[in-house]
């Protein structure tokens, strides 16, 4: 179908989705991309060049990606008369199934709190999937970063990120406080006359669809455990319910059984016959254990706020969010993204590390079934880092490293695909 501002390439075809949510990927799929704000202008072109090189090398012209630019954020506001998230963009992201985006800024002033959060909610991208791994040679503040190798499944649609809150002193806040006191008998609001109020929605459906994705990932990748991370010791009916619903889903959907009387459970991987342990950990204890015993964890399922903290804490252990990939996924739609911010003071300087977006594109290639191209991206990144040809964030911490710009780092990755 024709669009108002977006030009659909003549070559290429759409990715389609089967009834079982598997993908039909043509040899020349059209992939929408959002350049992103700030440093998006630097890192997105590098990502495209690296991906194109990997695909060309892997398939010798038999496959290629046909890129289609769509708009969100500051660039969209200029093209769509002030709209930061045009309806047209949302329609395209739904229709073309798989897309990738750079970092987005949040409009200053009232209204939309975060474009990233709004995008997830509008498209019901209820999973934020964040793989965390260390590449040899990357500077790390921990003693054995190679022990950290896990995938975070963060619930994207609920928890306090739903944005249901009222400003202290507002009429709406006063109404909610009055209702809580007079209708619900709440007596624990310490300073109720000048208090902001927020709601933390956590549902059975939202919790279980996330845990189902996490367990399926463990099955598909033959991983030994899924850990439910929560604060159920304090918030029993939200975080605690998440834990209970997770265990319930494991039993009912995957046949998990109690381990040594519970609450931990065990199940057989139906593809390999290996054991998968379903366990839970309190969030604050987990933040200690990822420093002290990271090798004990492989797949993590958690609610929105905990997932935000945990993802970035883990990224710091393996080199920072500059090389931390991520994807937001729903039933059939996936938007891969740079996990860092827009860093506007560096925009246009060809300076920052494009690794986060490149590794997110590697996730995209792997999910498309283009494993050979994905492997080449990994080989290129490994080679560039091992050779100490890196961007400034790594160069300043690596003795005898060679400082590269964003675009030069992309060229180094492509060069090391041949290694």
UniProtKB/Swiss-Prot annotation:
Pfam families (UniProt xref): Iso_dh
Key words, A-Z: Glyoxylate bypass, Magnesium, Manganese, Metal-binding, NADP, Oxidoreductase, Tricarboxylic acid cycle
Cofactor(s) of this protein: Mg(2+); Mn(2+)
Marked site (Critical for catalysis) residue numbers: 161, 231
GO annotation (BP), single: glyoxylate cycle
Record: residues binding NADP(+): 105, 340-346, 353, 392, 396
An example molecular function term from Gene Ontology annotations: NAD binding
Residues binding Mg(2+), per UniProt: 308
Entry EC number(s): 1.1.1.42
Cofactor binding notes: Binds 1 Mg(2+) or Mn(2+) ion per subunit. Mn(2+) is the most effective divalent cation in vitro, but the enzyme can also use Mg(2+), Co(2+), Zn(2+) and Ni(2+), with lower efficiency.
InterPro entries: IsoCit/isopropylmalate_DH_CS (IPR019818), Isocitrate_DH_NADP_dimer_prok (IPR004439), IsoPropMal-DH-like_dom (IPR024084)
Induction comment: Expression is not detected at both the levels of transcription and translation under standard laboratory conditions.
Binding, D-threo-isocitrate: 114, 116, 120, 130, 154
SMART domains in the cross-refs: Iso_dh
Control of this protein's activity: IDH activity is not significantly affected by monovalent cations. The combined addition of Mn(2+) and another divalent cation results in the decrease of the activity.
Activity's dependence on pH: Optimum pH is 7.5.
Catalytic activity annotation: D-threo-isocitrate + NADP(+) = 2-oxoglutarate + CO2 + NADPH
Temperature dependence: Optimum temperature is 55 degrees Celsius. Maintains 90% of its maximum activity after incubation for 10 min at 50 degrees Celsius.
Family membership noted in the UniProt record: Belongs to the isocitrate and isopropylmalate dehydrogenases family.
Role description: Catalyzes the oxidative decarboxylation of isocitrate to 2-oxoglutarate and carbon dioxide with the concomitant reduction of NADP(+). Cannot use NAD(+).
PANTHER family reported for this sequence: ISOCITRATE DEHYDROGENASE [NADP]
Assembly, per entry: Homodimer.
UniProt protein name: Isocitrate dehydrogenase [NADP] 1
